[in-house]
From Swiss-Prot:
Subunit structure: Homodimer. Part of the ribosomal stalk of the 50S ribosomal subunit. Forms a multimeric L10(L12)X complex, where L10 forms an elongated spine to which 2 to 4 L12 dimers bind in a sequential fashion. Binds GTP-bound translation factors.
The protein's name in its UniProt record: Large ribosomal subunit protein bL12
Annotated PANTHER family: 39S RIBOSOMAL PROTEIN L12 (PTHR45987), LARGE RIBOSOMAL SUBUNIT PROTEIN BL12M (PTHR45987:SF4)
Homology family: Belongs to the bacterial ribosomal protein bL12 family.
Molecular function GO labels: mRNA binding; structural constituent of ribosome
CDD domains registered for this protein in UniProt: Ribosomal_L7_L12
Length: 122
């Protein structure tokens, strides 16, 4: 007489833990399998496959109330002439520096924010 699925489930409900462990061990040996949980293959996470960003752009978003001081700081950072620095500041949002390291980008951001500018690092 073959056992039905219901018969097996009923036996498992009534069996002691030791009996279930013995059954699992016997099944593992008989069929060459393990009862270890199967890891589900998940898709890549949001950052998987993407390289860590090494170059950053410092974007001037707003010059705030101190346009002249921001122009002076942009000149010091970029080495641009007065007219070029003024045009850059007035063309916000605009990149002040592109392709710089994270440390340099943070330093530039700090300098510009100190004179009243609003800055983003991208």
């Amino acid at each position: 007489m073959a056992l039905s699925k219901e018969d097996i489930l009923k036996w498992l409900e009534e069996a002691k833990t030791a009996e279930v462990v013995e059954l699992i061990t016997a099944i593992e040996e008989k069929f060459g399998v393990t009862a270890a949980a199967v890891a589900v293959a998940a898709g890549p996470g949001p950052a998987a496959g993407a390289e860590e960003q090494t170059e950053f752009d410092v974007m001037l978003v707003s010059f705030g109330d101190s346009k002249i001081n921001v122009i002076k700081e942009v000149r010091a950072i970029t080495g641009l002439g007065l007219g070029e620095a003024k045009a850059l500041v007035e063309a916000v949002p605009k990149a002040v520096k592109e392709g710089v390291s994270k440390a340099d980008a943070e330093e530039i951001k700090k300098k510009l924010e100190a004179v009243g500018a609003k800055v983003e690092i991208k």
